[in-house]
Amino acid sequence: MAQPMRFMLNHIETESYGAFTPQNLSPLINRAIPHTRAQISGSPVVAVGRGSSGRTFFGVNVELPGLPLDHSIHAEQFLLANLALHFEQKLECIAISTNGYYFQEPCGHCCQLLHKIRDMSDTKILLTNPTGQKGTYMNLSTFLPQGLISQANVPRLLERNFNCIELINHSLYMDICSYSEHCNHLNCRALKAATISYAPDSKCPSGVALIDHRGKVYSGGYMESVAHNTSLGPVQAALVDFVANGDGQEFKNIVEAVLVEKKCGVLSQEATARMILEKIADPDCIFRVLHCK
């Protein structure tokens, strides 16, 4: 396993790398490639994005051992979940590469998810010709299906969101902290992740919290995209936190997990979450579901 890396650069570090060009991004891509987890396909992908705050964020593709590739985390999805972890609400430009010199457009799945960010159609996508010698910029709208129009009155991905949910078992609130994003309690972190998750179509918010063998907690919330393609499930969102902040650990070091979701929603994450964790986590990993309404 590669040495741990930081998946976010502050604005001062970002400025030191200069303009968002292939030449300046190449060393960043090459730094991130060893942190991709593409054991099945052998095809690493890195996404680099620059936020409106001036910070730089990384995303890498993550394939889950023993599971079909449709459960994988795309580099662009990882990037968006990483933005959410750092409360970044706007992506100014994005670059995607497999080797540090050829830059390509986002895949069709991820174009749909990227479009969920407000004003994302104007975000610049860095592209190069096959030789990687010349960089050009194209708007994300170029790659979106015709007729896909954002609804102005619908909440957008990465915007501050608060789902009005409460745990059905009220006795659990005795153990819920006021500032759960900074605590190390699984129930708190999973509830917080569900509260700020993005599910405007299904109205089924959900969140997952994981704990490793050292006692460190990671969390993530559902990111929904039903226009044409797939969403990012809460387990995968929590795994982004694990990969980005888990010091390069293997998934087998995950020893407990909590899912918070609606009791009688139109969809459930429980079966998928259980299947993923049974495959990748510690064989004795404890998995609990807390229902909300």
Curated annotation (Swiss-Prot):
PROSITE patterns, per database record: CYT_DCMP_DEAMINASES_1, CYT_DCMP_DEAMINASES_2
Matching InterPro entries: APOBEC/CMP_deaminase_Zn-bd, CMP_dCMP_dom, Cyd/dCyd_deaminase_Zn-bd, Cyt/Deoxycyt_deaminase, Cyt_deam_dimer, Cytidine_deaminase-like
GO biological process: cytidine deamination
Active-site residues per Swiss-Prot or TrEMBL entry: E76
Domain CMP/dCMP-type deaminase: 20-151, 181-293
Record-linked Pfam families: dCMP_cyt_deam_1, dCMP_cyt_deam_2
GO cellular component: cytoplasm
Calcium keyword on record: no
Cofactor: Zn(2+)
Residues annotated for Zn(2+) binding in this entry: H74, C107, C110
Keywords: Hydrolase, Metal-binding, Zinc
A GO molecular-function annotation: cytidine deaminase activity
Reactions it catalyzes: cytidine + H2O + H(+) = uridine + NH4(+); 2'-deoxycytidine + H2O + H(+) = 2'-deoxyuridine + NH4(+)
Stretches assigned to coiled coil: none
UniProt-annotated binding residues for substrate: N61, V62, E63
Enzyme class, broadest EC rank: hydrolase
Keyword Membrane listed: no
Cofactor note: Binds 1 zinc ion per subunit.
Subunit structure: Homodimer.
NCBIfam families in the cross-refs: cyt_deam_dimer
Annotated PANTHER family: CYTIDINE DEAMINASE, CYTIDINE DEAMINASE 8-RELATED
Main function: This enzyme scavenges exogenous and endogenous cytidine and 2'-deoxycytidine for UMP synthesis.
Family in the record: Belongs to the cytidine and deoxycytidylate deaminase family.
Protein name, per record: Cytidine deaminase 8
Source organism of this protein record: Arabidopsis thaliana
Gene name, Swiss-Prot/TrEMBL: CDA8
